[in-house]
Amino acid sequence: MRCLFQVFYIYMQRTEISSLGEFALIKRLTRDFPIQHESTRRGVGDDAAVIAYPEGLQTLVTTDLLLEGIHFDLTYTPLRHLGYKAAVGSFSDIYAMNGHPQQLTCSVGVSARFAVEDLEELYAGIRLACSRYGVDLVGGDTSASLTGLCISITCLGAAREEEIVYRSGAQPT
């Protein structure tokens, strides 16, 4: 019974985002994201990421925006699933062009109804996607939102120029 109470107590803890400050929040959300690519020279924790792809590779960049009430409903979507979906959705754009996703940034706008623990759940889904597909989280931003949750994911990938597949190259079957 004691163990069940401890789990319930941990679940019920609510840390206000404003109580941490920007840098402590970033550190808490990104502490378990390892760097997996040599091309990631500097990731989270500086003013900008530093990325250097080897010669011969082109950089592919895609951005996806997800808005609560438009692209997802939190009544039916756990935050961990949403984080995974947001990340993998951007990876798929890179894969569609025959590239390999390498780096990811995640920016979120959150209303006061979200706690730090909620953002940790969102980032747990992103972390799982990054781990599964070998992608580095290299930056992002957080901001207050008056109307729910907004997630913007930017994914960078690499491909050899001669191997890139464009939509314009699609042929009817």
Which residue stretches match the model-derived regions?
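Glycine-rich anion-binding loops of enzyme active sites
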Residues: 66, 101-172
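A short, N-terminal amphipathic alpha-helix
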Residues: 86-97, 130-133
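Glycine-rich anion/phosphate-binding loops
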Residues: 42, 74-89, 114-124
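Extreme N-terminal cap/leader segments of soluble proteins
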Residues: 7-78, 97, 106, 124-130
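Short Gly/Ser/Thr- and Asp/Glu-enriched loop/turn motifs at secondary-structure junctions
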Residues: 43-46, 90, 101, 148
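Residue-level signal for inorganic ion chemistry
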Residues: 50, 90, 98, 137, ...
